[in-house]
Swiss-Prot record:
Keywords: Chemotaxis, Cytoplasm, Hydrolase, Phosphoprotein. It comes from Xanthomonas axonopodis pv. citri (strain 306). The lineage of its organism: Bacteria, Pseudomonadati, Pseudomonadota, Gammaproteobacteria, Lysobacterales. This is Protein-glutamate methylesterase/protein-glutamine glutaminase 2. The gene is cheB2. The active site is at residues 174, 200, 296. InterPro entries: CheB-like, CheB_C, CheY-like_superfamily, Sig_transdc_resp-reg_Me-estase, Sig_transdc_resp-reg_receiver. PROSITE patterns: CHEB, RESPONSE_REGULATORY.
């Protein structure tokens, strides 16, 4: 079902999704109240939802759905600061993913983004929303050419030189990751290793996400900027639309934020972060791959393990989408498989 107050958006989304094999849009609605009436007749497998609508806003509608009958919801939001803040509230309330739409050139943009829309809806249909709904406590695919991390950071042999004893944590996640990261980071004490994070998310949204977490956590959380120090008690989140690399200068770690082609169709890419962590930190790192579709991060986690790092994959039961962790496990990149609730303890105890 598509719920959006724009007739143009509804028309284009229906056309794009109905053209995809295995997807059938059973209904559309201009606002949540109309959607509720239609859902009484035929409940959808996935809902594509705008967040700013008349009569009832999307967040209220989403909370109603998640409390009564948990259903995968994909947020379709405008690429603005206000849209980003509202979308963060939606993700906290149980939405599984977000796709963006501009204020201008809307029809062409949605048509050009057809592959992303279809992939996101397919992923949402597989999401473990019952697990997600139980966790809720608060009131992007790009180019067709699939690059590897080599386009950003060429592979090299050998382990990282042990020039420092400072420990770091590298975390990669995608679909369902906003809720998973909130659960992990809010459980951490103020004194913990420095953390670098890639969460697949559009540009402009990561700053709002980091700000929200910063207000909830004992540790500091911010959107990473070029040359930021990686310090104990602070987490840096890759900005949407840019890659994040871990670097080292003497005994200190810092991050590099840079442009470049999408890797595994993502920018930022988990593989890029993990490869840089393997190279810069070696055995002083802990790599964690969590819920998400696809295989981004699977190769990089294996590189971290081969460089001497401890590596962990989230288990299937607690993953919203068991794609990235499953692939990492299959390739031998994870030396431990843990439920989400054990991740914070792993960060604190394994890196002491």
């Amino acid at each position: 079902m598509v719920v959006d107050d724009s007739a143009v958006v509804r028309q284009v989304l229906v056309g794009v999704l109905n053209d995809a094999p295995g997807i059938d849009v059973i209904a559309t609605a201009a606002d949540p109240l109309l959607a509720i009436e239609k859902m009484r007749q035929h409940w959808p497998d996935v809902i594509v939802l705008d967040v700013e609508m008349p009569r009832m806003d999307g967040i209220t509608f989403l909370r109603k759905i998640m409390s009564e009958r948990p259903t995968p919801v994909v947020i379709c939001s405008t690429l603005t600061e206000k849209g980003a803040r509202v979308t963060m509230d939606a993700l906290a309330a149980g939405a599984v993913a977000v796709v963006t739409k501009p204020r201008l050139g809307l029809k062409q943009f949605l048509t050009d983004s057809a592959d992303e829309l279809v992939a996101t809806v397919r992923s949402a249909a597989r999401a473990n929303v019952k697990r997600l709904a139980a966790r809720v406590t608060a009131a992007p695919l790009e180019a067709e050419v699939k690059h590897t991390a080599d386009v950003i950071l060429p592979a090299q042999s050998g382990r990282a030189l042990a020039q420092t004893t400072e420990r770091i944590v590298a975390i990669g996640t995608s679909t369902g990751g906003t809720q998973a990261l909130e659960e992990v980071l809010t459980a951490l004490p103020r004194v913990c290793p420095g953390i670098v994070i890639v969460q697949h998310m559009p540009e402009k949204f990561t700053a709002a996400f980091a700000a929200r977490l910063n207000g909830l956590c004992q540790i500091a959380v911010k959107e990473a900027a070029n040359n930021d120090r990686v310090m104990p008690g602070r987490a840096l989140i890759a900005p949407g639309g840019k890659h994040l690399l871990l670097r080292r200068s003497g005994a200190q770690y810092f991050v590099e934020v840079l442009e470049g082609p999408p890797v595994n169709r993502h920018r930022p890419s988990v593989d890029v972060l993990f490869r840089s962590a393997a190279r810069a930190a070696g055995s002083n790192a802990l790599g964690i791959i969590m819920t998400g579709m696809g295989d981004d991060g699977a190769a990089g986690l294996l590189e971290m393990r081969q460089a001497g790092a401890r590596t962990v994959a989230q288990d299937e039961h607690t993953s919203i989408v068991f794609g990235m962790p499953k692939e990492a496990i299959k390739r031998g990149g994870a030396d431990r498989i843990l439920p989400l609730g054990a991740m914070a303890r792993e960060i604190v105890t394994q890196l002491q």
